[in-house]
Amino acid sequence: MSNNEKVLSPIEIKELERPQDFSAFQLKLASPEKILSWSCGEVKKPETINYRTLKPERDGLFCAKIFGPVKDYECLCGKYKKMRYKGVVCEKCGVEVTSSKVRRHRMGHIELVSPVAHIWMVSSLPTRIGTLLGVKLKDLERVLYYEAYIVSNPGEAYYDNEKTKKVEKYDILNEEQYRTISDLFEHTGFEANMGGEIVRDLLAGLDLFELLTLLKEEMETTKSEAKRKTIIKRLKVVENFLNSGNRPEWMMLTQLPVLPPDLRPLVSLDGGKFAVSDVNDLYRRVINRNNRLKRLTELDAPEIIIRNEKRMLQEAVDALFDNGKTANAVKGANKRPLKSLSEIIKGKQGRFRQNLLGKRVDFSGRSVIVVGPSLNMDQCGIPKKMALELFKPHLMAKLEEKGYATTLKAAKRLIENESNEVWECLNEIVDEYPILLNRAPTLHKLSIQAFHPVLIDGKAIRLHPLVCAAFNADFDGDQMAVHVPLSQEAVAEAKILMMSSMNILLPASGRAIAVPSQDMILGIYYLSLVKEGVKGEHKLFTDVNEVKIALDMGQIDLHAKIRTRIGDRIIQTTVGRLIIHEILPSFVPANLWNKILKKKDIGILVDYIYKEAGYEVTPRFLDDLKNLGFKYATIAGISISIDDIRVPENKIMHISKSKKDVIEVQKQFSQGLLTEQERYNKIIDIWTEVNNKLASEMMELVKGDKNGFNSIYMMADSGARGSAAQIRQLSGMRGLMAKPDGSIIETPIISNFREGLNVLEYFISTHGARKGLADTALKTANAGYLTRKLIDVSQNVRITIEDCGTHEGIEITDITSGNELIESLEERITGRVIAEDIIDPISNEILFAEGTLITEEDAKVVTEAEVKSVVIRTPLTCKVENGLCSKCYGLNLGEQRKAKPGEAVGVVAAQSIGEPGTQLTLRTFHVGGTASATQTERELKADKEGFIRYYNIKKYVTTDGKIIVANRRNAGLLLVEPKINAPFKGKVTVETVHEEIILTIANSTEEKKYFLRKNDVAKANELAGISGKIEGKLYLPYKDGEEVNLNESIVEIIKDGWNVPNRIPFASELKVEDGAPVTSKIITGAKGIVKYYKLTGDYLERRHDIKAGDIITEKGLFAVIADTEDREALRHYISRGSCIALNDNTEVEKDTVISAPAKNEQVVIAEWDPYANPTIAEKAGVISFEDVIPGVTVSEQFDELTGTSKLVINEYIPSGYKPTVILTTDDNEIIRYSLDPKISLNVSEGKRVEVADIIGKTPKATQKSKDITGGLPRVSELFEARRPKNIAILASFDGVVSFGKGLRNKQKILITDSTGNSVEYLVEKSKQVLVHEGEFVHAGEALTDGQISPHDILRILGEKALHYFIVSEVQQVYRSQGVNIADKHIEVITSQMLRQVSILDGGDTKFIVGDMISKKKFKLENEKIIKLGGNPAIAEPLLLGITRAAVTSDSIISAASFQETTKVLTEAAISAKMDMLEDLKENVVIGRTIPVGTGLYKDQKVKFSEQEISK
């Protein structure tokens, strides 16, 4: 609890009084005494009511004496009626005269003859009773169901006559064993028994303290991991009992509580039948069996019969508590299993989800929606009939207040007659009163918005066209629900926060969602088009009014180019655009409206106006835009005719050529030149190519048609409806179709819709269409479930304070996938608070100080300064105990302002991720065919300028002088430009002090120090390409103690980097030497004056002697673009070999060429064989073979093209053989190369090889079509933190690789660090190992192929690396589908997945090793222990999937209402868990104000202060 000192004591809930406000909720096991104290009497008979008199039977399940009167203040026999006898107990029928409401909470009890186990304690895993006794679940069940004996006192008993195996306490014996042993050892005190009694006695006899110490001792001595796990399980249960004050024997019931009768009602239906709650049937069975058992015991029946009856009693109680868990569930009259107490509370139809989290409410209605184009942004049309019903109470009050009616009855009559006064009053009420509209499915907060109602005739609700996008509504029969907010607070909230004019932005991304669509876009687009050579062209007008007059008089065309004055400038525009300009606020610059406005441009315009003017102006502007759009869409008269669909003339020619190509491919296939897969891929490629060619020709044709006024083209181009792909199907060719399994059918549909499809083509196309529909249905369900899980895990995240004061942050860069940018740094830092100063890499000035909230403009400044990474505060590094602080969260995107305390950011995050879920694809992508027909990479080219640095590169030089890469990893090429040059010749020293690196250069006479920030310098693992990005980081080419010459660069900025093996494969040929210059065309990035400088030390020295035409030969030359006041705007490095294009002091515009390479070609950095991985000779020497046996391990393959034959190692090598090539060098050193399957040998026995000669080549896996999990399944895989099936093994720390002796089907990889510690990994032989003997690997580097598990990233690289992994992976899925989601939402969920820790060492705390504890509890407990001077516990962070994280929530109610209800409740009851009711979900369930918004302060006294307002 927030203030831990508060001592909580249990509250007795009194009958008939409202329970007082409680601050926590706790579950415990009930003792028999407690059950008796609840009970108002024993239920002795199974009867319910008398079917003749319909009165409850005495002592039965509905007994009025026990549970209270059926009618208010009236006893059963009718002797006492009315209030005045309250509290009297009738002497005739024994019923207390009171309110009948007591039947909802008065309980009864059943006195059980024999103790019975509570099924949750037995079969809810881990079984609690079994764990305490140390008995397996199966055995425990056999004892409870009277099939086996449990030993309560072993005495001196043995299992055998030789007395070798002793009988222990709690051993389980079958009938035979029991007979034998008890005959032999009865006299020694041996006792065993079966059933509930003995289990209860054993539980009662447990000494928990003794058991605890025993277990702890055993834990320390045991070596076996499996045994430890079992001990930990037992320890947890024992500790739970000790801490909670529960007694173990309470898990066995001797008194069974009976639910109050009104909670298991018996309702009479018409026709004399009764609807009865299933629980009653289950209780009747228990009572029947209990009574029968009582009778049998009194009669002294034979043991076997009594035993059977006891077993049946146990089964009856089991069925009552949890009918689903029992093997053969009890079925009712309709052959359906009866709903037991557990089933009533769990599942979608259970108490939690059906009645507590979602309720039906009054003052609501629903109807079909139709469009209301004449409404304002915050209005909606409500049918009069509906309003009359919804506002009835308000209306009656109003009628009385105005004197139209004297009594309520009169008012009711007036309303029924619908007289004029009624409508008058209704209009007055409705005027000021907001209503809420909701469209199911309610996926995000914009699915419920408030409107001012406008009364209309008819029966449909009218909706404003611009809010459709937020509701995801259309008018094809959608329905919406209307709700009336009742309380003053609710009305205020609706008016201030929920009005649709306040909900213009999407909370997921901060972009405007209330933007015009379809017809409106078409109208605005039409208005903004230009037509050449029309009436009134090039005229000059004074203002818009003059233009309008001319237009109305027919003197000028709507699309004519004209000139007019706007502000103080004359502008060239068109009539239509002027009309648009008229509705724009005055501050909108011309470049936003004076152009053709498409959907995207309109969106940008709305965003801009919102940013500049906010809620005051935007709604009004949107309404004007809507009206304009509809008006001109109508005037334009755009309609589709069949002639608008233009088919390219040379379609037939293209298609016949493609058919020939296909026949050619088939021929090659039948001659055996192509494999089946290649044939298929080639055919698909042919058709894809022709389809694209036709499409581009057709688009040109349509675009030119009617000067760009072709209706279909206008619709697609403006973004109103349709797309290029759809036009292609109308008038190009339909193209290739997919089968339901996602594979592409190789026969394309050649026809288009204009020509019409033939039967076969139509049949092929039905395939895809049906799959689409089936997918959509599945997708909706999956997306809905994902949203539910996300909401549940993040519902308790809210902003609680302004600033948590942390200085920690996470470094972020662009998110890229390969070479494709997924999300830019600019987008990622907008609206975030930075955790470290942002420093300009060129001038070293502080651009923004720590703690600044970065706006969109600031983000642009950062990108223009070429800052490559920024450290921002994130929800993961926030230090607040409950929730987050405003600064770590950043901007509230839905309102574009700082998040305030009390905002439910967790729910918003979950909605933002879940809502677009339905737009994601469901399938896993099959790569192959068109999808991956990309050219294989065979070389690397540089596209920036600078010079080359080798990082760790080892090389072989071949006889003909080629440089071959000898590293397999941990090396790379860097493209750099100088940052600091050596001011004199000297020795370099590098030292790290805290967050700084001090670089000193010194000789006998002088010394100079340079200070660098540690974070700015590229780390070793970044240079090796393991983590992070290196562009923009600093590189130190000289190590500590090395000599450096004058003007050599000692600090360099990395502009690009290619690491081995990801970008440059092993054995590639390098085309550039270390230090070689790389030139490329340099273009100015800003406007200004070009000046040339030379770098000396760490400052620039002016050079006046550089002129156009010079070819640069010196290092360290920069061109600086300066503004008029000689401030540096940008600097460009000019590398050696560049030809200067501009003289010094030339004034330039943006995008002017400063210099270009003297030789006109792109610099190739490296080349390699794209189809094979070579094995090369490290030294010169002679080859010999081992285990290379033709017909056994190798086969000879004849190459048709070259006419030679080669040896190829077989794919499957018989066990016992290990084909190897042995190279004996000239120094008699022996190097062994073990040969992988499929490798083809380029050498023969006894052949001499030189350095870097190729020994053999392994073909790269012929492009297997890989299944890439994409779309929705990928997102849920990430959030569920699933361990991938094909998991990659990662190195746990930096070290050197070696291979140990392998097992039969596993190989052993060892990694040894610098101190000699080593760790070994066993890898399946079928896995491809990516490392080689003697290589150095970094922590987190993959040793084998496969997918990387997020758990490994967390374990090895920590939370920050995990943050990058999850955010970038989720963003890749959403961005590829065109969905924008801000990172902060994903981070909020990730921080919730990391809220648990796993205990490594319990110290002096109450935690046990292996416990999963929330970070909050862990911190509290540790603080407590440290105060007392003890040893704190040590833990490691755990990554839990969202389902696990939600179920392990600290709150009982929250976890129970999510999933696995019985498990959660059992756990909570045993450990007497306390729910502090801090989060949203539990407060919704118990019906209190939720702690967000103003509810955050509900416990605090609010003070009011008066203020004088000056008039």
UniProtKB/Swiss-Prot annotation:
Cited InterPro entries: DNA-dir_RpoC_beta_prime, DNA-dir_RpoC_beta_prime_bact, RNA_pol_asu, RNA_pol_N, RNA_pol_Rpb1_1, RNA_pol_Rpb1_3, RNA_pol_Rpb1_3_sf, RNA_pol_Rpb1_4
Keywords carried by this UniProt record: DNA-directed RNA polymerase, Magnesium, Metal-binding, Nucleotidyltransferase, Transcription, Transferase, Zinc
Cofactor(s), by name: Mg(2+); Zn(2+)
Ligand binding (Mg(2+)): 474, 476, 478
GO biological process terms on file: DNA-templated transcription
Superkingdom field: Bacteria
Family, as annotated: Belongs to the RNA polymerase beta' chain family.
Functional note: DNA-dependent RNA polymerase catalyzes the transcription of DNA into RNA using the four ribonucleoside triphosphates as substrates.
Protein name, UniProt field: DNA-directed RNA polymerase subunit beta'
Source species of the chain: Aliarcobacter butzleri (strain RM4018) (Arcobacter butzleri)
